[in-house]
């Protein structure tokens, strides 16, 4: 696309960053001074009844700055990057038609990538192939299947944990159906996003500061009733640890504690560690992200001013 046609496209803003970096607070401040509407880009915030452990904006924050694509799925339901792209594009079109600018805020980098670049042409799920993979897993264990994926697609294997049966079986399924690896196919993009996008990433200047923020927030969640929230989900009886919702950081560790697998102290330790690992993965994505402007989360006023300098001109 040439520069002239790109300038004529409608505007959009991405506000990305690792967990606990202050994205939501900045987005809410920006909505006060810019003609923007917020769209959540978070694979955990989509779930109803999962508010504390996901750091979902509270009622006052949502009144000041409504977020779209929150609470759109029950924790028992799946939600893919393709689902997100479809829903986000519909919301963006609605916002643009109303003469406002979509501000997409969150930390699910796969969703941002799917939206920006389009989706690769992956084969549809095949129940017969999936059943065969699950039978193999029952006989050999997921660790053995992960080793199989390591031989077929080492790049995907490095990204997928042996204890993540959903993603592991999908990577194998794609290969068995198409004869091509998940890595090969995901390098083929679909339709690019038809917007002129201004991209920002917010994070603390040092890893130590981010780790401190993560630990503090986890303890704040515990003090706010996180255990009771997960116990309510556990009591339903239809949820389990193979679901993406219950595999969310914090929830998986609290679930293990409720099941009696680990102590409370171990749950806290693992919850903080898994959140740090999530932040590390998010930062790895962002460091390789093209066209992003970095903002310092330790100086929110300056971050807001930097966004306004860039976006204020396009919002006029």
UniProtKB/Swiss-Prot annotation:
Catalyzed reaction equations = adenosine(37) in tRNA + dimethylallyl diphosphate = N(6)-dimethylallyladenosine(37) in tRNA + diphosphate
Site entry: Interaction with substrate tRNA? 108, 130
Function (record text): Catalyzes the transfer of a dimethylallyl group onto the adenine at position 37 in tRNAs that read codons beginning with uridine, leading to the formation of N6-(dimethylallyl)adenosine (i(6)A).
Question: Does the keyword section mention Disulfide bond?
Answer: no
Q: What is this protein called?
A: tRNA dimethylallyltransferase
Q: Which organism is it from?
A: Salmonella typhi
Kindly list the biological process annotations in GO that this record carries: tRNA modification
Renumbered to this chain, region (Interaction with substrate tRNA) spans: 42-45, 166-170, 247-252
Name the top EC class.
transferase
Q: One MF term in GO for this entry?
A: tRNA dimethylallyltransferase activity
The UniProt keywords, alphabetically, are: ATP-binding, Magnesium, Nucleotide-binding, Transferase, tRNA processing
Residues bound to ATP = 17-24
Listed EC numbers: 2.5.1.75
Q: Which cofactor does it need?
A: Mg(2+)
Q: How does it assemble?
A: Monomer.
Which family is annotated? Belongs to the IPP transferase family.
Q: Where does substrate bind?
A: 19-24
Q: Which domain of life is it from?
A: Bacteria
């Amino acid at each position: 696309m040439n520069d002239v046609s790109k300038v004529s496209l409608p505007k959009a803003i991405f506000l990305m960053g690792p967990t606990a970096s202050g994205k939501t607070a900045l987005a809410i401040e920006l909505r006060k001074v810019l003609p923007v509407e917020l769209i959540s880009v978070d694979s955990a915030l989509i779930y109803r009844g999962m508010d504390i452990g996901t750091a979902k904006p509270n009622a006052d924050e949502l009144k000041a700055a409504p977020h779209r694509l929150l609470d759109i799925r029950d924790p028992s339901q799946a939600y893919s990057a393709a689902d997100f792209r479809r829903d986000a594009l519909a919301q963006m079109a609605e916002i643009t038609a109303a003469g406002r600018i979509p501000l997409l805020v969150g930390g699910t980098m796969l969703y941002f990538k799917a939206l920006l670049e389009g989706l690769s042409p992956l084969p549809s799920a095949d129940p017969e192939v999936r059943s065969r993979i699950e039978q193999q897993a029952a006989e050999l264990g997921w660790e053995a299947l992960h080793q199989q994926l390591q031989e077929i697609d080492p790049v995907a294997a490095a990204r997928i944990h042996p204890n993540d049966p959903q993603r592991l079986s999908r990577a194998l399924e794609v290969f068995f159906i198409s004869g091509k690896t998940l890595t090969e196919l995901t390098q083929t993009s679909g339709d690019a996003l038809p917007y002129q996008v201004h991209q920002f990433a917010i994070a603390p200047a040092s890893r130590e500061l981010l780790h401190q923020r993560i630990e503090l927030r986890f303890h704040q969640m515990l003090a706010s009733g996180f255990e009771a929230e997960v116990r309510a989900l556990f009591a339903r009886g239809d949820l389990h640890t193979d679901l993406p919702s219950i595999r969310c950081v914090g929830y998986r560790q609290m679930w293990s504690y409720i099941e009696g697998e680990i102590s409370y102290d171990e749950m806290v330790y693992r919850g903080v560690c898994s959140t740090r690992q999530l932040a590390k993965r998010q930062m790895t994505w962002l460091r390789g992200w093209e066209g992003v402007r970095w903002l310092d989360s330790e100086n929110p006023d300056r971050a807001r001013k930097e966004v306004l300098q860039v976006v204020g001109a396009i919002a006029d």
